[in-house]
C-alpha cells in the first residue's frame, strides 16, 4: 500500500477531465458535490464509484491480490480494496483530510470472506463506504465486519479483538 500512495501522488487518478460513464468529467462532478454537506459528499462518492463492475485481481492482473491506483481502477475496474482506494482518493480530492479516513481490511463473518471498505470519520462516527451497497452506514450497524487492519497515507493500524482474561490457579 505504500507504493500505492506514492504512485497516486505522482499520477493522480482524479484529474479534471477524468470521465465517469454517464456522469461527465470529474471537475463537473466535483463542482456539484462541493455544495453538499460532508456526509452527502460521502454518500454521492459511494454511489458514483459503485457503478464500476466488480472484477477479481485474478481476472484483471492474474494474481491473487493487487492494490490498484485509481488510474488503474478506472481503466480496468477491480475488487473490494480497489473500490475502497478509489473512494478514498475521490474524497481526498474533495478536501477530506487523510486523518478522517481509512482503507479498512476486514473479515466479513456472515460470508466468511476477507473484504475491504473505506471508513470516514464524521460527527463522532465512522461511516462505511462499501462496494456491496450504495447505502453508507455507521460502523455500529455492521457488527458482522471484524476489522483486521487499516491504512491511510500517514499511518497503519492493527485491529485486535479483546479476549476475556484467563483464570489461573493459585
Predicted regions and their residues:
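Short, small-residue-biased leader/transition segments that mark boundaries at the very start
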Residues: 1-4
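Secondary-structure boundary elements
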Residues: 19-73
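Short leucine-rich amphipathic alpha-helices used at interfaces
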Residues: 65-66, 71-72, 77-79, 122, ...
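Active-site nucleophilic cysteine motif
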Residues: 76-87, 91
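Hydrophobic/aromatic-rich core segments of domains that either
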Residues: 89-144
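His-Asp-centered catalytic microenvironments across diverse enzyme cores
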Residues: 125-170
Amino acid at each position: 500500500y505504500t507504493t500505492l500512495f506514492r504512485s497516486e501522488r505522482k499520477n493522480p487518478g482524479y484529474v479534471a477531465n477524468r470521465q465517469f460513464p454517464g456522469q461527465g468529467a470529474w471537475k463537473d462532478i466535483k463542482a456539484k458535490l462541493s455544495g453538499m454537506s460532508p456526509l452527502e459528499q460521502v454518500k454521492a462518492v459511494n454511489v458514483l464509484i459503485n457503478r464500476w463492475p466488480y472484477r477479481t485481481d485474478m481476472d484483471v492482473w492474474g494474481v491473487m491480490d493487487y492494490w490498484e491506483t485509481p488510474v488503474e481502477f478506472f481503466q480496468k475496474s477491480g475488487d473490494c480494496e480497489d473500490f475502497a482506494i478509489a473512494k478514498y482518493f475521490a474524497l481526498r480530492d474533495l478536501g477530506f483530510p487523510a486523518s478522517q479516513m481509512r482503507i479498512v481490511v476486514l473479515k466479513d463473518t456472515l460470508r466468511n470472506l476477507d473484504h475491504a471498505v473505506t471508513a470516514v470519520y464524521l460527527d463522532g462516527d465512522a461511516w462505511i463506504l462499501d462496494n456491496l451497497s450504495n447505502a453508507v452506514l455507521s460502523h455500529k450497524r455492521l457488527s458482522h465486519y471484524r476489522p483486521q487492519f487499516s491504512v491511510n497515507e500517514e499511518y497503519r493500524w492493527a485491529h485486535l479483538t479483546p479476549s476475556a482474561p484467563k483464570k489461573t490457579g493459585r
